[in-house]
């Protein structure tokens, strides 16, 4: 069962990315990605 997850920037809280996951997990996904508003690579966390 795959689910759609939305990633938001940890600094400015803008929702920049959406990813699909293979299975449901209890832990939040954290990935370092590029943020357009911050103009740099920042930590992005999964929103709920």
UniProtKB/Swiss-Prot annotation:
UniProtKB keywords? Ribonucleoprotein, Ribosomal protein
Q: SUPFAM superfamilies under this entry?
A: Zn-binding ribosomal proteins
GO-annotated molecular function: structural constituent of ribosome
Q: Which Gene3D superfamilies does the annotation name?
A: Ribosomal protein L33
Signal sequence, start to end: none
Q: Name one GO cellular component term.
A: cytoplasm
Asked if the keyword Ribonucleoprotein belongs to this entry, the reply reads yes
A Gene Ontology annotation in the biological process aspect, one of them, is:
translation
Tell me which NCBIfam families the record gives: PRK00504.1 (NF001764), rpmG_bact (TIGR01023)
Q: Could you say which protein family the record assigns here?
A: Belongs to the bacterial ribosomal protein bL33 family.
Q: What is this protein called?
A: Large ribosomal subunit protein bL33A
């Amino acid at each position: 069962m795959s689910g759609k997850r939305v990633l938001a920037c940890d600094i400015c809280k803008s929702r920049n990315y959406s990813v699909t996951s293979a299975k449901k997990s209890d832990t939040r996904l954290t990935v370092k990605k590029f943020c357009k508003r911050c103009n740099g690579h920042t930590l992005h966390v999964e929103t709920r």
